[in-house]
């Protein structure tokens, strides 16, 4: 049986893979595993210490169904559900800590298309769960029904009316220099950032032009947001803005565009923030944490600045693990997941946007000038849809194609092939001295993957 949890929670097509029944079972299992008191002590006493779980979601249509199912699972185990509504994933993580909840649940499929949805669980303090805890929850999902509380022991559903304001006050602490005079276009992806991001940036003083900020439940990530940067690029040029920011469906990512429409990806953002934090004496151990997907240009820029780079597997959970184990202060991914542990336990697109604009305001430099600290090697990424991503990635013919590509590139580039943690695809990434070489090498390797798929 395939593992229920992927690299970022449980995901699938809503009502087919991720059903209401599964959502209820996950809510129930999480309550049993993560609550701090047992069901046996929580059956009849109205004076008992209530266990609490924060529950949030993005605006996709299936979120309402899955939210109701998760809450049913929680309350059936005697856990109160503190419903915070449509909020970014990092807000739910923060509020899990701020409300001193036992755990938190975010219902979102992030950058995935509208038919998909997902369930992500945060432990105490808003931290992502480790593999062992996820495995135990999965065991409980498959274990079936158990004796449950009755009467006053059943959990209640509460609404946190101050949730958004509380998160915005927290995010605002990331502002080191007021943003007065800066004009920013923000693409909210018709997602969880639709209200939070424009408010956060305006509160910091920026002139904000919000686009794709009218969620219907059906239009999340639909040709917009951080996976469709051409939209914000065009808007920045049209409005003559200083920069553009693009979030994904749950706003844990942030990518940027300079005034000319040039994309500033997560690698470049990390370089900008690392240099700023080094200057301020805030870069712990003079170290940045990045993943194997980060461009070689990031490593060269950090080496020139005397900053060490710790490299992890792909996925912000692995970045988080390295940040926590090494007590580092900055890490992230090329995709725009940027983590600053002093501000949160997970990637926060809005905090990233505020920090990036603060650096612009502090230095008086344009985003293009700041991004010039890093020069990326041409990078080509091809996603190949396959039936069994793990088997295909390990096929002898595919490994042979990768070895041949590595021999061809030598010291002038690199290749990375890996199964996606969230989609049924194998990702082929190639960096080379010139784009033509990168494309040709990537195409050959992708063809070998496709033939196996």
From Swiss-Prot:
Keywords for this protein: Isomerase, Magnesium, Metal-binding, Phosphoprotein
Entry GO terms, CC: cytosol
Residues at the active site: 110 (phosphoserine intermediate)
Record bears the keyword Phosphoprotein: yes
Enzyme class: isomerase
Chaperone found in the keyword field: no
Primary gene name: glmM
Record-listed Mg(2+) binding positions: 110, 248, 250, 252
Positions carrying Phosphoserine: 110
Function text: Catalyzes the conversion of glucosamine-6-phosphate to glucosamine-1-phosphate.
MF-aspect GO terms: magnesium ion binding; phosphoglucosamine mutase activity; phosphomannomutase activity
UniProt record similarity statement: Belongs to the phosphohexose mutase family.
Catalytic activity entry: alpha-D-glucosamine 1-phosphate = D-glucosamine 6-phosphate
Cofactor remark: Binds 1 Mg(2+) ion per subunit.
Originating organism: Mycolicibacterium smegmatis (strain ATCC 700084 / mc(2)155) (Mycobacterium smegmatis)
Annotated protein name in UniProt: Phosphoglucosamine mutase
Source species, domain of life: Bacteria
Processing after translation: Activated by phosphorylation.
PANTHER family membership: PHOSPHOGLUCOMUTASE (ALPHA-D-GLUCOSE-1,6-BISPHOSPHATE-DEPENDENT) (PTHR42946:SF1), PHOSPHOHEXOSE MUTASE (PTHR42946)
PROSITE patterns noted in UniProt: PGM_PMM
GO process annotations (BP): carbohydrate metabolic process; peptidoglycan biosynthetic process; UDP-N-acetylglucosamine biosynthetic process
EC number: 5.4.2.10
CC cofactor: Mg(2+)
